[in-house]
Design a protein with these regions (language model features):
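Acidic, mature catalytic/reactive cores of soluble proteins
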Residues: 1-269
Length: 269
């Protein structure tokens, strides 16, 4: 009965979309291309709460009719916006500059803050730096020397922040898995680090959870470090990072997988 009802619903209210080709989305692509300048900012010096960055960057939104405007660059927003720029060689300088800004923040603060605002340096955002590095490395066919330097920044972030070597037991808290955190030890601010600000997902107790997404991102980091080691012909690094990734995968499957429900869930440790 349910199956028949579902079939009737889809036949009545749902149409399978046609496959689009380049001509169908030409107008949308042109709009996006012309919109990038509205999102681009240049601020090389610290001004009030805004932290200066060495290169132009993108802000997450712009609306000319709104009195509010963004002037800061956000960590994971930047990664996803750059996905829309990688296919056009004309964007290479801006894309490379945005990634270099993240490296600059790691050099200055030992981490990538939520955004380049002084009141947002108490926490980060979901770690996407290795994905960013490899997207740029592959898109622009960069050399191994560049990759080695870029990966070194990601490793510094990995160890300082997510593995809690700089501030022990703040992020990495249970059986090798990590949580979102804020130096003010406040649940809502830790939730902001998740990028889900704000959400019912953690029941306003974000500090108590080992999140699926965060630990998956860190598994990607460890896998990417292994891949970089292979490219750089560092066999010792390959072995080390393969073991690290396998260890995290085992912990994720052990703690975050719910066999009865057939899915992964955040774990209240």
């Amino acid at each position: 009965m349910i199956s028949k009802t579902k079939n009737l619903f889809f036949r009545t209210f749902w149409q399978i979309p046609q496959v689009l080709d380049a001509s169908d989305i030409k107008e949308a692509r042109e709009y996006i291309k012309q919109f990038w300048p509205h999102l681009t900012r240049v601020q090389r010096d610290d001004v009030d709460t805004l932290i200066g960055l060495p290169n132009p960057y993108l802000v997450p939104a712009y609306n000319e009719s709104s009195a509010f405007t963004f002037d800061e660059m956000y960590y994971w927003d930047s990664y996803f916006m750059v996905q829309g720029m990688l296919g056009d060689p004309k964007n290479k300088q801006l894309v490379m500059g945005i990634l270099d800004n993240l490296f600059f923040l790691i050099k200055r603060y030992g981490m990538v803050p939520n955004a380049n605002k002084t009141y947002l340096i108490s926490h980060s955002q979901p770690p996407l730096l290795t994905s960013f590095v490899f997207d740029v490395y592959n898109a622009y066919q960069l050399d191994r020397r560049w990759l080695e330097q870029a990966i070194s920044y990601a490793k510094k972030e990995y160890y300082n922040v997510w593995m809690a070597e700089k501030k022990p037991h703040h992020h990495q808290v249970y059986q090798g898995l990590s949580r979102y955190y804020d130096v003010n030890v406040h649940h809502d601010l830790a939730e902001a680090e998740s990028g889900w600000d704000m959400t019912t997902r953690f029941g306003r107790k974000c500090l108590d959870y080992l999140p699926v997404d965060l630990n998956t991102f860190l598994y990607v980091y460890e896998s990417d470090f292994m891949k970089a080691s292979e490219i750089l012909q560092d066999q010792e690094g390959v072995v080390y990072w393969r073991k690290a990734a396998a260890k995290r995968k085992k912990a994720i499957n052990s703690l975050l997988w719910n066999e009865r429900r057939g899915n992964f869930f955040d774990f209240n440790y």
